[in-house]
Amino acid sequence: MSVQAPSVPDLRQQVHDAARRARSAARGLATLSTDTKDRALRTAADHVLMNTRAILEANEADLDTARSSGTPEAMLDRLALTPARVEGIADGLRQVAGLPDPVGEVLRGRTLPNGLQLRQQRVPLGVVGIVYEGRPNVTVDAFGLTLKSGNAVLLRGSSSAARSNAALVDALRAALATELLDVDAVQLLPSADRASVTHLIQARGLVDVVIPRGGAGLIDAVVRDAQVPTIETGVGNCHVYVHSSADLDTAESIVLNAKTRRPSVCNAAESLLIDAAVADVAVPRLTDALQAAGVTVHIDPTEDELRAEFLSMDIALAIVDGVDGAISHINEYGTGHTEAIVTTDLAAAQRFTERVDAAAVMVNASTAFTDGEQFGFGAEIGISTQKLHARGPMGLPELTSTKWIVWGDGHTRPA
């Protein structure tokens, strides 16, 4: 009989140990004062800026690896950090520090006829797992929002951003140590082995919720295999519908902004719907404008293209029969993210907003506005495309649950 030499803890054990440390940290975070959390967030912003050089060097190493492996330009843009983007990341932490603290907020309360006093108040979720692709800014956004809402966070980023994420987390943990807080409030899980995702999403009893951020493949895999609660985020086949009453100058401006501002993000428009009543005029005009901006317009889209989240300078074009045709098309092909109508007809706008099934519905505005910062939430943990427990851009309140507090005076319940 052979005897194996002792080995380091396996990956499952590493992930579970990290979750236990996060649980311990979360218990302390749950009762921190708002002032303490805000001070820690401002210190974290300072530490990110102090470490800009190390962060950018780590990011450049990630970019070099990504380029050598043929990563598409849109994905390189998501991965890239610049001095301005690092400054923006730090500013995001300061913005979160300035937001109202949701923890302890009383949602409702009453005194029962028997004298019992009830109140329902917000409490942290506990341990939040984030699984995300090559976007280093998510590392800090997730930390800021989870800390302010009293949660600990386990981060499992993409291996493509491993060096960037490590440099950022080092800065965040140093800030927590400076403020004498538990550094395990934020932990970065190994990204080289995909099994770490499995161990995280199946850590029932150790992790309270997992939020996947990324493409459809990642999100579907997490939701399918998870044994802990999940919140689906981000897959965005967003449509812009140009109604028969639309001002075409307005429509052109909105369509171009929704498609070309940042084509690699989930709130970018992927489909353009044009009302049949104005197709003869609107199709050539909007197609020419999009093509002049470098967009490939799929004029006779396949079924797959109608369902695609391109995340690139591509857009599917379809002709629909009136507002009901647009609603039917969107409810068939949309992903429940963001849908927009361009119209001067109030009745059409109201019908569209009432009947389209999406987390956000825009009237005469670009889909690009579906964003936590644009909505005034500061950074966002993601944009939920499901209906429970949160929907749309997820800010601080969406990272809480509730607890009932009942005060009595020796009350007992009669038989």
From Swiss-Prot:
Documented EC number(s): 1.2.1.41
SUPFAM superfamilies (alphabetical): ALDH-like
Reaction equations catalysed: L-glutamate 5-semialdehyde + phosphate + NADP(+) = L-glutamyl 5-phosphate + NADPH + H(+)
Top-level taxon: Bacteria
Cellular location(s): Cytoplasm
Top-level class of the enzyme under EC nomenclature: oxidoreductase
InterPro entries xrefs: Ald_DH/histidinol_DH, Ald_DH_C, Ald_DH_N, Aldehyde_DH_dom, G-glutamylP_reductase_CS, Glu-5-SA_DH, GPR_dom
Pathway involvement of the protein, from the record: Amino-acid biosynthesis; L-proline biosynthesis; L-glutamate 5-semialdehyde from L-glutamate: step 2/2
Matches recorded under Pfam families: Aldedh
Keyword annotations: Amino-acid biosynthesis, Cytoplasm, NADP, Oxidoreductase, Proline biosynthesis
GO MF entries: glutamate-5-semialdehyde dehydrogenase activity; NADP binding
Cellular component per GO, a single term: cytoplasm
Record has Cytoplasm as a keyword: yes
GO BP annotation list: L-proline biosynthetic process
Chloroplast as UniProt keyword: no
Biological role: Catalyzes the NADPH-dependent reduction of L-glutamate 5-phosphate into L-glutamate 5-semialdehyde and phosphate. The product spontaneously undergoes cyclization to form 1-pyrroline-5-carboxylate.
Family: Belongs to the gamma-glutamyl phosphate reductase family.
PANTHER family, per the entry: DELTA-1-PYRROLINE-5-CARBOXYLATE SYNTHASE, GLUTAMATE SEMIALDEHYDE DEHYDROGENASE
Protein name: Gamma-glutamyl phosphate reductase
Gene name linked to the record: proA
